[in-house]
Every structure is written in C-alpha cells, then in structure tokens.
Regions:
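Signature of long, low-cysteine stretches enriched in small and polar/charged residues
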Residues: 94-141
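Secretory pathway targeting signatures of secreted, lumenal, and periplasmic proteins
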Residues: 37-77
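Sec-dependent signal peptide recognition
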Residues: 2-8
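Hydrophobic h-region of N-terminal signal peptides that target proteins for export
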Residues: 9-18
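Mid-chain, structured segments of secreted extracytoplasmic proteins
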Residues: 66-103
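N-terminal "mature-domain start" segment
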Residues: 19-49
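Surface-exposed amphipathic alpha-helical segments
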Residues: 147-192
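Glycine-rich, often proline-containing surface loops adjacent to acidic residues and nearby aromatics
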Residues: 64-74, 114, 146-155
Length: 192
C-alpha cells in the first residue's frame, strides 16, 4: 500500500511539474528564430526584481542535455554592457585556476560587447571532461521609455561524448568565427 501511495505521489508531482507554464517575462514569444531554426521557450526565471532569464532549445532537445541553447537575459537598471561583461570575465579568470579548459576572447565595437568562451564540467577527480561548453554572448544597452538596462543574447553549444568534443574542437580550430558572425548579425531582441 505504501509503495502505491509513493508511486501515486511521484506521478502527481511529475504531472503538475509538466503542467507548469513557462513565463515569457520579456514578451519575446514562446519561439525564437536563430540560424534558420525555431527554438522554443522552455525555461524562465525572475530571480531578482531587476533580473530576467529565458532559455530556448530546439523542440527535439532536452534542457538538461541540449546541443544548442539560446539564452536571453535582461538586467534592468543604469548599467553599461562593459560592466556586465567585466563581471563574467572576472568569474572566468577565477575559475581558470580549477578549470584549465576555460578560454575566452572579448570583442568590442561601437560600445557593444561580445565574448566567446569555452569551459567544461569535469569529473570529481578532475581527470575527465564530462561536458564541454562553448558560449557566445552579445551584450546590448537597452534604453527605451519602458525599459533601461543590459540585454544579453547568448548561444550555448554543448558536447557530451569524446566524438562530440573532438568535433567542437575542430569547429573552434577551423570555423570559430562562424558562430560569432551569426550572433553579430542578429537584431536586438525587442523586449517589452
């Protein structure tokens, strides 16, 4: 009897979790088009009064084990893109001490900033790379009558197997700027 009750409770929790609607805090819609593909809004958060996060993946992917994820964050306030970027660069520099894979390049043009960085999640003993992740983030200053702050548009690519990781390193070696150029070409997402 206890086992049935536990199974029923687990089922109910999963059912209600599946019913939870993802909030479109930035009013961008439940789909976002990038690189001729439609990504669906699968996760969002409003962890602080002035901070919003939204994540999009391809319909056939899982947010816990995605190949590519689009992230759009907005920090409201009198902030400059350079300051928000500096915070990430400081974090990467501090993490480099424990994670030798971390590497990054910052781009700046017309007071807009981008960062292209690679990092990894390693096994507890540090001998094996479990996840290899490449991110390209672009920072925009938003200054409209309704919203002021910094918007981050990011693309996160992940590799989980040795073959996928080798492919990612090959792309970084031979076609590194392809993704950077695609992110450069996007229009500023129109948040409301």
């Amino acid at each position: 009897m206890k086992r049935r009750l536990v199974l029923f409770l687990i089922f109910m929790v999963q059912f209600f979790m599946a019913q939870k609607k993802v909030e479109d805090y930035l009013h961008l819609g439940d789909k976002y088009r990038f690189d001729n593909k439609d990504y669906k809004l699968v996760w969002s958060s409003h962890p602080m009064d002035n901070f919003y996060k939204q994540e999009y993946i391809l319909p056939n992917e899982n947010v816990e084990k995605y190949k590519r994820l689009i992230l759009i964050d907005f920090i409201e306030g009198d902030l400059a893109p350079k300051d928000v970027l500096s915070s990430l660069v400081n974090s990467l520099e501090n993490s480099k001490k424990q994670n030798l894979v971390i590497n990054y390049k910052v781009y700046e043009k017309n007071n807009e900033y981008m960062i292209d960085f690679i990092m990894s999640e390693n096994s507890q003993d540090g001998k094996e790379v479990l996840i290899l992740e490449r991110n390209v983030y672009r920072y925009f200053r938003i200054n409209t009558p309704k919203r002021k702050g910094v918007l981050l548009f990011g693309v996160s690519d992940r590799a989980y197997t040795k073959k996928e990781m080798d492919n990612m390193f090959s792309v970084l070696k031979n076609k590194k700027l392809d993704l950077v150029n695609k992110v450069i070409q996007i229009e500023v997402p129109k948040i409301k």
